[in-house]
Amino acid sequence: MLKKYLITFCLISLFSINSNAAGTGDAGTTKSDYDKAVTIIKSAKKYEKKGKTEKANKRYEKAQKLLIKSNKKKPLQADTLNYLGFTTRKLGDFENGEKYYLLGLEIEPKHIGINEYLGELYVVTNRIDLAKERLKVLENCNCEEY
């Protein structure tokens, strides 16, 4: 009888060790700082549409911090620079927002998001001719940004 319990205990222990060794499966699902920032930006846009500017700005600030971290880890990524320009512009710093956009365009001149958002920045800062140049780049993209 004791032998039976001992064998059962050993088998249970053996299966427990194997299942713990397999892990939880979460190791590969950690979101990057960039991905987290994009999710936060989407949330901020929803608050902005509802007129909740303060909540939107808090999210833009949070996203901006994550994007700065992302840019340090993987510098000069056009998508990251696009959203850095976007969050910076949304927080009212048009000059630095423009710098991020222009740096992104040096890397990827036909980047749809950068051209769209830079055009918006030019409209807000009353530089319509420059906004039209951004539109010209988007003219043949067959995209909603145009």
At which residue positions do the language-model features occur?
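Residue-level recognition of tetratricopeptide repeat
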Residues: 77, 111, 145-146
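TPR/TPR-like (Sel1-like) alpha-helical repeat modules
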Residues: 106, 119-145
